[in-house]
């Protein structure tokens, strides 16, 4: 079973009538076998759909139009089995609005040395057929992924899956609706941004709602549904006897369950995939949602604290991209440092860290929240699972959006954190904290990020290219002087690119 159950990537093979029916029959047969192999492979998480070989400008244009109008098609894979004159592709590529990958492969891995003849050469000529197609893509300035290698190799299939996941994320971005309850935290700069420009570039919509509308949805939740929700909490988390045995704590938990159910209903009925709130805008609420927000993220919703709709969008998009993979994705904040033999970052937030990144079964506890509405708030406590991760931040620079990515190594804390009443993750940024933090600051990266152990750097690279957005990467090879030069060069390129 594929992780993406209703989404598809179309496989389109290019050729021409010049070769005659026998060769074209072989081309079609080989294409069908490749598609079958992809669908049988556990490495590729989305259904690949075979489309008949295209041999003329009219056929190419028609299949590109069909891909555009198919809601389940998130992208297309294009392969030139033989030579397919590239002028035939101009109208179709001009029309194509879905992302496309150029797969530079051939059906047979090895040459049949003792049997090879000109018939074989004319049938299996992607080595130069794909170069012809590559030229027209470059000439038309089409952003695309190029994957090179035999279609059965694990490396090629991993690259295909990365791109397919990015295409699914891009499809989600085009259809995503984000609900904002309240506004940005007052006087904060980086969470601001041009929502119209974001919708033009990324596709997602951001809509504001009053707390009164949300409170109405919460008030409408039946007490019986709240009781059933508490039973779910007891079965899914570590819960001390004192929580359910203490009348006050139980009341706080019931209020939190009611918030979760009301918020879920509001978002679901409105077709929203992500939301934001702000501790400064909680009129009528019993408190800042803690457990409720954590569970909504665990169920796939994106979230951004303090009105941060850009991060909420990225959390949702990355959750979609990571479907079926080990590891989770969460809203996150660089909170405090541990300077020592190896400098580290303790990431957390007031309440809202997703349990999908937890190293062990989370504990459900009630603790005092002292910012905004000061009250006792139920929340899940855990530390993040050790392993590779990334932090991704999207910022608005006024004339463009920039995505900043830092590769991390999450580690197990050397000691317990018995007095910390929030979930957290401890990581070592690559190449080290000194370089990573300086680069992040030079790039203008936010204090919020989308943290993930399910998503790879390559997937974010593919997504950024689909979006036409600037991406800068901080990894083991980053050097500050080179990184600052990259930022300067990007400023020139993206400033000129709009007019080219």
Curated annotation (Swiss-Prot):
List of residues binding Mn(2+): 306, 333, 349, 448
Keywords: Arabinose catabolism, Carbohydrate metabolism, Isomerase, Manganese, Metal-binding
UniProt keyword Manganese, yes or no: yes
EC number: 5.3.1.4
Entry's Gene Ontology molecular function annotations: L-arabinose isomerase activity; manganese ion binding
UniProt entry tagged with the keyword Metal-binding: yes
GO CC annotation: cytosol
Annotated catalysed reactions: beta-L-arabinopyranose = L-ribulose
Superkingdom of origin: Bacteria
InterPro entries on file: Ara_Isoase_C, AraA_central, AraA_N, AraA_N_sf, Fuc/Ara_isomerase_C, Fucose_isomerase_N/cen_sf, Lara_isomerase
Cofactor note: Binds 1 Mn(2+) ion per subunit.
Cofactor(s) annotated in UniProt: Mn(2+)
Enzyme class, first EC level, given as a word: isomerase
Pfam families to which the protein is assigned, alphabetical: AraA_central (PF24856), AraA_N (PF02610), Arabinose_Iso_C (PF11762)
Pathway, per record: Carbohydrate degradation; L-arabinose degradation via L-ribulose; D-xylulose 5-phosphate from L-arabinose (bacterial route): step 1/3
Alphabetical GO biological process terms: L-arabinose catabolic process to xylulose 5-phosphate
Functional summary from the UniProt entry: Catalyzes the conversion of L-arabinose to L-ribulose.
Family: Belongs to the arabinose isomerase family.
Name this polypeptide is given: L-arabinose isomerase
Organism: Shewanella sp. (strain MR-4)
Encoding gene, per UniProt annotation: araA
């Amino acid at each position: 079973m594929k992780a993406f159950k209703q989404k598809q990537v179309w496989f389109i093979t290019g050729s021409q009538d010049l070769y005659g029916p026998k060769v074209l029959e072989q081309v079609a047969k080989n294409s069908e076998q490749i598609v079958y192999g992809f669908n049988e492979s556990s490495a590729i998480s989305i259904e690949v759909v075979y489309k008949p070989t295209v041999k003329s400008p009219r056929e190419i244009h028609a299949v590109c139009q069909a891909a555009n109008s198919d809601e389940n098609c998130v992208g297309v894979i294009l392969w030139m089995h033989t030579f397919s004159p590239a002028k035939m592709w101009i109208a179709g590529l001009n029309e194509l609005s879905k992302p496309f990958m150029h797969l530079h492969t051939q059906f047979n891995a090895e040459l049949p040395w003792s049997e090879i003849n000109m018939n074989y050469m004319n049938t299996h000529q992607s080595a130069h057929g794909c170069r012809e197609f590559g030229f027209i893509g470059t000439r038309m300035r089409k952003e695309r992924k190029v994957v090179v290698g035999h279609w059965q190799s694990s490396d090629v299939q991993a690259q295909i899956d990365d791109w397919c996941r990015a295409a699914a994320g891009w499809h989600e971005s085009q259809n995503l609706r984000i609900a904002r309850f309240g506004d940005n935290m007052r006087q904060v700069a980086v969470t601001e941004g041009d929502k119209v420009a974001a919708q033009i570039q990324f596709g997602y919509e951001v809509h504001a709602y009053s707390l009164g509308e949300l409170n109405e949805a919460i008030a409408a939740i039946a007490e019986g549904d709240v009781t059933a929700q508490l039973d779910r909490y007891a079965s899914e988390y570590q819960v001390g006897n004192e929580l359910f045995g203490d009348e006050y704590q139980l009341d706080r938990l019931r209020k939190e369950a009611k918030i979760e159910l009301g918020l879920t209903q509001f978002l679901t009925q409105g077709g929203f995939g992500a939301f934001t709130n702000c501790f400064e805008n909680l009129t009528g609420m019993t408190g800042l949602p803690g457990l409720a927000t954590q569970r909504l993220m665990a169920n796939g919703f994106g979230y951004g604290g303090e009105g941060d709709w850009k991060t909420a969008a990225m959390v949702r998009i990355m959750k979609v991209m990571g479907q079926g993979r080990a590891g989770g994705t969460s809203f996150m904040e660089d909170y405090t440092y541990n300077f020592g033999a190896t400098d580290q970052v303790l990431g957390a937030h007031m309440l809202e860290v997703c349990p999908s990144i937890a190293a062990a079964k989370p504990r459900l506890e009630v603790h005092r929240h002292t910012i905004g509405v000061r009250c006792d708030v139920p929340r899940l406590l855990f530390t993040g699972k050790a392993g590779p991760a990334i932090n991704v931040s999207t910022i608005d620079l006024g004339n463009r959006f920039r995505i900043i990515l830092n590769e991390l190594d999450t580690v197990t804390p050397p000691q317990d954190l018995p007095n910390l009443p929030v979930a957290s993750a401890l990581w070592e940024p690559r190449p080290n904290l000194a370089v990573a933090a300086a680069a992040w600051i030079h790039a203008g990266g936010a204090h919020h990020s989308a943290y993930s152990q399910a998503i790879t750097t390559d997937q974010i690279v593919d997504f950024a290219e689909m979006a036409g957005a600037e991406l800068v990467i901080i990894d083991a090879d980053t050097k500050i002087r080179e990184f600052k030069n990259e930022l300067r060069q990007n400023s020139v390129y993206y400033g000129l690119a709009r007019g080219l």
